[in-house]
């Protein structure tokens, strides 16, 4: 078993990674302090893993809530359902929430944990590749608003992240590919050697080879933990984790949440960011081609929707959380393995990239 730690003083927490972790009760129960637990999951994950988790928690008073599946349900209405479920059964501050599912479940349950009675503990049990390598670690919790993604939320750290790589065996191929976008992101912004490893080992990952999966997930979590330890609330280096997300969030908001998976939109966004960097002279043509080829090898889109023009992108991008003093700030790669935040990308530069980057 791989065991990492996010070092945040009194709020530090472990990340545990292995195949078959959800067969062992002690892994899940070690950070639960009270006697009451509420598991929140969705209609896809519940038939696969809910009963198993309930059995692991045989010594606790366990309730569960099953939500609809999909990004379309990452809303204030879903958040309110969780609040109502907790209130109706008189849960207190000693209750532990368990987020059993992918990124949507993790984000909305984390936000509920941050908000209920001003904060109760929660545990992340991510079941998708995207949530295992990215969204379950770092304490970003949120719901979407019709005008923007993740606009309502909080920084609130889990008590524990339990990553069972066996869960990926039940993940649809499209969802696996979407998760690979975040894996590739870490190589682009932080670790050129990891990027090269991905170029060589993509087929092993797609074949779900246990050793390859364990290494990739661990490396992503190591990078994420390092970044979060340095900059928990995203005032500096953590912003680099948003590579592709400014363009990507615009695609998601414009096309309707869930029509493009988050990872698919981020992949197209990373290609647009890389193209912007190449046009500015910060990325050479060979590096741009390597990024494009790796995204394609992962079965990810490299172009934005054909019917999404400059005005649609800009309308959403101006609402991005990285906008500062009215200036749009973009994360752009500087070679492979490094990235920077820039605030001087002109509308003409964006127009050129958007027009050339559509299907």
UniProtKB/Swiss-Prot annotation:
What EC identifiers does the entry list?
Answer: 4.2.3.4
- GO function term, MF aspect, one: metal ion binding
Asked if the keyword Cytoplasm belongs to this entry, the reply reads yes
Class in the EC hierarchy, top level: lyase
GO BP, one annotated term = aromatic amino acid family biosynthetic process
Residues annotated as binding Zn(2+) are 182, 245, 262
**Recorded catalytic activity of this chain's protein:** 7-phospho-2-dehydro-3-deoxy-D-arabino-heptonate = 3-dehydroquinate + phosphate
Q: Which residues bind NAD(+)?
A: 69-74, 103-107, 127-128, 140, 149, 167-170
According to its UniProt record, which protein family does this protein belong to? Belongs to the sugar phosphate cyclases superfamily. Dehydroquinate synthase family.
Name this protein carries in UniProt: 3-dehydroquinate synthase
Query: Which source organism does the UniProt entry give?
Result: Aeromonas salmonicida (strain A449)
Q: Which gene encodes it?
A: aroB
């Amino acid at each position: 078993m791989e065991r990492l730690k996010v070092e945040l003083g009194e709020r530090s927490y472990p990340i545990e990674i292995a195949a078959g972790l959800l067969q062992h009760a002690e892994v899940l129960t070690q950070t639960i302090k009270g006697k009451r637990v509420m598991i929140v999951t969705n209609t896809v994950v519940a038939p696969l893993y809910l009963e198993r988790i309930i059995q692991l928690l045989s010594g606790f008073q366990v309730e569960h809530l099953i939500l609809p599946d999909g990004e379309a349900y990452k809303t204030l209405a879903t958040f309110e359902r969780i609040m109502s479920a907790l209130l109706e059964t008189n849960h207190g501050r000693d209750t532990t929430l368990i987020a059993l599912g992918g990124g949507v479940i993790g984000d909305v349950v984390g936000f509920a944990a941050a908000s209920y009675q001003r904060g109760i503990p929660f545990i992340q049990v991510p079941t998708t590749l995207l949530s295992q390598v990215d969204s379950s670690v770092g304490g970003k919790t949120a719901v979407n608003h019709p005008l923007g993604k993740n606009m309502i939320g909080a920084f609130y750290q889990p008590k524990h992240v339990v990553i069972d790589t066996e869960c990926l065996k039940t993940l649809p191929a499209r969802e696996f590919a979407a998760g690979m976008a975040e894996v590739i992101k870490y190589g682009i912004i932080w670790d050129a050697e990891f990027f090269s490893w991905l170029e060589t080992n993509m087929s092993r990952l797609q074949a779900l080879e246990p050793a390859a999966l364990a290494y990739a997930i661990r490396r992503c979590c190591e990078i994420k933990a390092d970044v979060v330890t340095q900059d928990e609330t995203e005032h500096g280096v953590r912003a680099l984790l948003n590579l592709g997300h400014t363009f990507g969030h615009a695609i998601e908001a414009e096309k309707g949440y869930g029509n493009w998976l988050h990872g698919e939109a981020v992949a197209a966004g990373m290609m647009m960011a890389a193209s912007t960097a190449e046009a500015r002279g910060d990325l050479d043509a060979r590096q741009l081609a390597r990024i494009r080829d790796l995204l394609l090898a992962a079965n990810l889109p490299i172009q934005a929707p054909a019917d999404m023009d400059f005005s649609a992108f800009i309308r959403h991008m101006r609402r991005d959380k990285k906008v500062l003093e009215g200036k749009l700030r973009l994360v752009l790669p500087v070679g492979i393995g490094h990235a920077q935040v820039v605030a001087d990308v002109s509308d003409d530069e964006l127009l050129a990239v958007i027009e050339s980057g559509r299907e």
